[in-house]
Design a protein with these regions (language model features):
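ATP-dependent adenylation/nucleotidyltransferase module used to activate substrates
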Residues: 2-5, 11-194, 250, 269-280, ...
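Alpha-helix N-cap and loop-to-helix initiation/capping positions
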Residues: 34, 126, 218-221, 263-266
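Short, aliphatic-rich beta-strand segments
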Residues: 78, 245-256
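Mid-to-C-terminal catalytic subdomains of enzymes
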Residues: 179, 183, 187-233, 238-242
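Flexible glycine/acidic-rich beta-alpha junction loops that bind and position SAM and/or redox cofactors
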Residues: 204-216, 249-253, 290-295
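C-terminal boundary motif of the adenylate-forming
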Residues: 239-246, 286-288
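Short, conserved charged micro-motifs
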Residues: 258-270
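Short, low-order "capping/linker" segments at domain edges
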Residues: 293-304
Length: 304
């Protein structure tokens, strides 16, 4: 599989566009131009490729990459979605729906990260083993079909936080066209909105194993319980929610503007009773709300 280099001029984070404000504001036109330059750089880079596999989860980033690649290369793009216990069915459904709506070539494959003891042990670099499993499959598909490039949806904001999963794509020569073009999450949401992608305002997503504290074993039973608990919250109208699984305790991380609603007596009773019916003994609401990589906080405490 070949690895190519995109040569682009990146704008700084302070130059990224915002969906807030009006066109008449003094900074709107330069910001819009900056976004359009990034989009043009992405389109040019994609058009230089003969064919491409997109690691397509159906999240904000990979959905936009799939859209942009399909726009540039048409049927020469294959979007591949992994099906495993760690991947919520809700997200697979979104991936299928968007692929059908926009006409992507879409393939769903089974991955077996749960068969890897090193993954189930849930070390701090658990994501590496999951990504290694995924790209082992994608590399095989690429070889069978003569597709020279695999790409993921990493963006320019993903350089922060603790992300051991990024090592695996580097080992397989996976490209990150959104990152290479300087596109941030905010940029991608705005471009997705313009393109009519229903994923443009989807909350950030991560695999279900990310709800389990490091060094606590990942099991099929835990993943099913977490998925069912989060489905309860989605059905109750909560958009941003993570059920952090602490054995018999469900610690709910919600959007900051949704915490008050969860604590209303009637709603609190509904959440508590439904999650206890699933098997949790205690249900708590984290007063700090949802934050990216919150379980990494425990890693930092272990290092003190």
């Amino acid at each position: 599989m070949t690895k190519e280099t995109i040569s682009t001029t990146r704008t700084t984070r302070s130059g990224r566009t915002s969906t807030r404000g009006t066109v008449g504001e003094a900074t709107s036109l330069p910001l819009a131009a900056s976004l359009e330059r990034k989009e043009a750089a992405l389109d040019l880079a994609l058009r230089e490729l003969p064919s491409l596999i997109v690691a397509y989860s159906g999240g904000v980033d990979s959905a936009y990459l799939a859209y942009a690649a399909h726009r540039a290369l048409g049927s020469s793009v294959l979007c591949v979605t992994a099906d495993s216990p760690s991947y919520p069915e809700r997200h697979r459904a979104i991936a299928r729906r968007v692929a059908e709506q926009f006409g992507f070539n879409h393939l769903v494959i089974q991955t077996e990260e749960m068969a890897r003891p090193e993954y189930r042990a849930n070390p701090a670099n658990r994501c590496y083993f999951c990504k290694h499993e995924l790209y082992t499959h994608l590399s095989a598909i690429a070889g069978e079909r003569g597709i020279p490039v695999i790409a993921d949806g990493s963006n320019a904001d993903d350089r922060g936080d603790y992300r051991p999963g990024r090592q695996a794509p580097r080992e397989f020569g996976v490209r990150s066209p959104l990152d290479e073009s300087g596109l941030t999450k905010e940029d991608i949401r705005e471009l997705s909105r313009r393109a009519g992608l229903p994923t443009w305002d989807e909350p950030a997503s991560a695999c279900l194993s990310s709800r389990i504290p490091y060094f606590s074993e990942v099991t099929d039973e835990k993943l099913r319980l977490i998925e069912r608990a989060e489905a309860v919250l989605h059905d109750l109208g909560f958009r941003i929610c993570r059920v952090r699984h602490h054995d018999t305790i469900a610690r709910l991380e919600l959007g900051r503007d949704e915490i008050a609603r969860a604590l209303e007596p009637e709603m609190a009773e509904t959440i508590d009773s439904q999650l206890r019916a699933l098997g949790y003994a205690h249900v708590t609401v984290d007063l700090r709300g949802y934050r990216l990589g919150s379980l990494n906080e425990a890693l930092r405490l272990r290092q003190v």
